[in-house]
Design a protein with these regions (language model features):
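Catalytic cores of the polymerase beta-like nucleotidyltransferase superfamily
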Residues: 1-362
Length: 362
């Protein structure tokens, strides 16, 4: 069952060739009244397709198909199109987004429909749909209603918008309509950037002008949008990269490979591209040095270093271990012996251990 309380079940079916498909089957529903501008007071199961379609938000979503000769998995599916509004097909073909009924009424029922409308602007390679003028006006004049909508619902829609093929164009339209002034107050939105396919990267890119540090910025946005800890951490790390000058040296690239997960690498590279950084040299070196001979872990531990140097447990021993790990990675050393030989290269007994750099990037 998926969403059983909403009358939705997952059905597995087989076509004539034995291929298995899954589809969601949802009971017809009808809404009660809307009194809080967030959601219907109650939703009841129904048996009338007309009532179900009448409760939809946009004309392109207010259509259904009545199967005539099977649909799923069939080579020649057939069915009867139900477009009771009468404008769904036309709007779908012309790329127009408009509401079922009066736009003011639909928006007043559920403020989230304002954000949801922007998601439905996306047509992939087909570019953007256009707002019906009535819908555009209704959105701009009802922005304060978003304060009634839960942050979680808004973030769920924004994630999907930031994952769209045309996310930058949609963000521009959201800025023009005043959406971000309500959902991200005090955050300057940058619309002059090249977006990726990663919604967290794209969120970091459009918020790149925020002057506060990564942790402060991500905490602020996390409280406004209810980001998860993982999302907030990634946003913070990316924001800290905004002023980095990529060092394409082999040492830097190896440290990048050793300290970042595959997801982090992908996100950072996408983010730097979005900022317009020159990535060619760095990415070329990364391809050549992505695999380290000994992996990313240290070849020597604190016990061995203590045995060789006579150092007891403490900050000096700990910093020495981390320094050796850094040099191991930067030089791509392959054996314990090679790492131990590094001890002869500098005065680890008397130099200031606070200046010894451990493995990190950048």
């Amino acid at each position: 069952m998926v969403g059983e309380e909403f009358g939705t079940v997952l059905v597995r079916v087989e076509d004539s060739k034995g291929r298995e498909f899954q589809c969601e089957v949802t009971t017809l529903r009808k809404d009660g009244g809307y009194t809080d501008g967030r959601r219907p007071d109650n939703v009841t199961f129904g048996n009338d397709i007309a009532e179900d379609l009448a409760r939809r938000d946009f004309t392109i979503n207010a259509m259904a198909i009545e199967p005539m000769n099977g649909l799923l998995g069939e080579e020649s599916p057939s069915g009867k199109l139900i477009d009771l509004d009468g404008r769904g097909v036309k709007d779908l073909q012309s790329g127009l987004l408009r509401t079922v009924g009066q736009a003011e009424e639909r928006i007043a029922e559920d403020g989230l429909r304002m954000v949801r409308a922007f998601r439905f602007l996306d047509q992939g390679e087909g570019g953007l749909r256009e707002f019906d003028p009535e819908l555009s006006i209704a959105i701009s004049s009802n922005i304060p209603m978003l304060s009634k909508v839960s942050r979680e619902r808004i973030w769920n829609e924004l994630q999907r918008i930031l994952s769209c093929s045309n996310s930058m164009l949609i963000v521009e339209s959201m800025v023009e309509h005043g959406i971000f002034e309500e959902i991200l107050p005090g955050i300057s939105i940058n619309t002059n950037t090249s977006m990726s396919n990663d919604y967290i990267v794209n969120l970091a890119l459009i918020c790149r002008d925020e002057v506060s540090g990564g942790a402060e910025m991500s905490d602020k946005i996390a409280s406004l949008l209810r980001l998860s800890r993982k999302e907030s951490s990634a946003l913070s790390s990316l924001h800290e990269c905004r002023e980095i000058d990529l060092d394409p040296s082999v040492e830097s690239v190896r440290r990048f490979s050793a300290t970042m997960s595959d997801t982090q690498k992908s996100q950072i590279l996408d983010y730097m591209r979005g900022l317009g950084a020159d990535m060619e040299d760095f990415e070329s070196k990364l391809k050549q040095n992505s695999v380290l001979k000994a992996g990313s872990g240290p070849l020597v531990d604190g016990s061995l270093i203590s045995e060789i140097t006579g150092l007891e447990g403490g900050k000096r021993l700990g910093r020495l271990k981390h320094w050796l790990h850094r040099i191991q990675v930067e030089r791509d050393l392959a054996s314990e012996e090679e790492v131990v030989e590094l001890l002869a290269e500098f005065d680890w007994k008397n130099s200031d251990f606070e200046e010894w750099q451990g493995l990190s990037w950048p």
